[in-house]
């Protein structure tokens, strides 16, 4: 079973520098893993930083070319859709892989994993089989750019009887404020309002047993590993 660790980022180089070393070491030591990093238009030097790191086995860096409205659910879908693993794991850029690979292999694809210690910033560590991701259509791209998207993802998986197991986070993540979370989003709506409105939509979909709310995905073109371009279509 191949595991894809999937990250999206915009202007978080200061945090990425703190987590990248251990995460790259993990990928290098664990065969049948890969790390997909999607840069959603960073202007803080991430592109040049990645270029200086050079080519790395099973590490895939994509930079968006025509994506101008940054939304976390859409960006998370980009990273997973560009990955190739049988098992996909959303890894926020301020988090460490830690011992996730061990637990995923122990539990197998029939069980999802999550680390639900919200206040410590590790709620975004969510994994499931690719089959399940495809069945529920990924993260809900109609959501406002932040708030409740991880909870919604897990709840929709549960609608089709896919179970999740809590796994501990071996290494503490880089702590964030809500201000940091939303500062690069293309919206004037505060986090609390987005969280509330997305929560209302989540409850409505669950009540109606809608486990796959996306009718189509967001299209996008990317530069891949500084060499060639690729494209994601909008089909589910």
Predicted features, each with a name:
Residues 151-236:
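C-terminal catalytic/acceptor-binding lobe
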Residues 2-4, 34, 152:
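Cell-envelope/extracellular polymer assembly enzymes that use nucleotide-activated donors
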